[in-house]
């Protein structure tokens, strides 16, 4: 990916991934778009919506302002389509979104307020206030603070909707297209932590996730089609079974393969999360030359040995 710079100032580009196989998914897309349009009073030219459709025979139209539908010739890849979206948009801010979400009033203004007051922050997430995510409840994230920083999954980082400034990709490079839907969120967390980019969750910004309603999730873990039954073929160490991976990955071998691919790239996920917590606890450690050294597979193996864990 070429150097992409900062984009048009104050403009938000929203990239929504869709696989509209039926009217249910189409209506889900419409609900997301309509809630987005109603969530703010958008100044002219300051909102761009790009829906990237995987159904190459897509029969659906979206009669809304600022909405473009792109049907790539390429085979679907979660990160591949996000990279295509980056190339086809021009906003200073880019929101990477599932289609099973509902935007609440003022969600982007709340992110902008934090971004304007803390210009060193480049990566943001809204909260989900439905109660479905325990780490985002008022008890876990008291609302008396406008933001919290860290990299914890479904706490500081909401993979269903996250907003990064365009300049992030001049620091990190593009999304890794060898990483697909299965495990992409862990790869994105490591992208941020390796490059000393805090993931900042904004407590006044609300985007609720209607979990499990996308086409790709509906087809995952159903019946025996993807379920792992040969455990010798898909082994986990005892440590991984108890500390590293949720055992529901056995419901779908594609999740297993995705996490194993990340293990080859980043090392043991549990140790990376341990390191992310340490840096969150001691933020003086969060500077780029150090984090780029720490978040490597070689250092991951060293930390594993120091922790008494077999990598």
Residue ranges and their predicted role:
Residues 21-40:
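Short, well-formed alpha-helical segments that are part of the catalytic scaffolds
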Residues 44-56, 70-72:
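Short beta-strand/loop segment that forms part of the nucleotide-sugar
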């Amino acid at each position: 990916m070429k150097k992409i710079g900062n984009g048009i100032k104050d403009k938000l580009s929203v990239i929504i991934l869709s696989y509209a196989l039926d009217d249910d998914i189409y209506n889900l897309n419409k609900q997301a778009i309509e809630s987005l349009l109603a969530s703010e009073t958008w100044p002219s030219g300051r909102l761009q919506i790009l829906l990237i459709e995987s159904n190459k025979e897509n029969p659906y139209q979206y009669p809304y302002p600022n909405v473009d539908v792109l049907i790539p010739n390429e085979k679907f890849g979660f990160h591949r389509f996000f990279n295509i979206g980056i190339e086809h948009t021009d906003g200073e801010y880019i929101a990477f979104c599932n289609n099973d979400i509902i935007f609440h009033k003022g969600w982007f203004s709340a992110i902008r307020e934090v971004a304007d007051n803390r210009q060193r922050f480049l990566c943001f997430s809204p909260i989900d206030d439905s109660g479905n995510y325990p780490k985002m409840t008022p008890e876990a994230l008291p609302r008396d603070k406008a933001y919290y920083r860290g990299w914890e999954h479904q706490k500081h980082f909401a993979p269903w909707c996250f907003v990064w400034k365009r300049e992030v990709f001049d620091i990190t490079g593009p999304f890794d297209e060898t990483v697909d839907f299965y495990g992409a969120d862990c790869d994105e967390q490591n992208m941020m932590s390796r490059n000393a980019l805090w993931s900042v969750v904004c407590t006044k910004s609300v985007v609720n996730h209607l979990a499990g309603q996308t086409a790709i999730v509906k087809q995952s873990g159903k019946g025996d089609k993807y379920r792992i039954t040969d455990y010798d073929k898909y082994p986990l160490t005892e440590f991984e079974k108890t500390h590293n991976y949720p055992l529901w990955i056995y419901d779908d071998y594609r999740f297993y393969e995705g996490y194993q691919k990340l293990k080859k790239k980043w090392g043991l996920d549990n140790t990376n999360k341990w390191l992310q917590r340490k840096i969150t606890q001691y933020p003086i450690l969060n500077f780029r030359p150090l984090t780029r050294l720490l978040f490597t597979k070689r250092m991951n193996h060293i930390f594993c040995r120091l922790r008494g864990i077999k990598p």
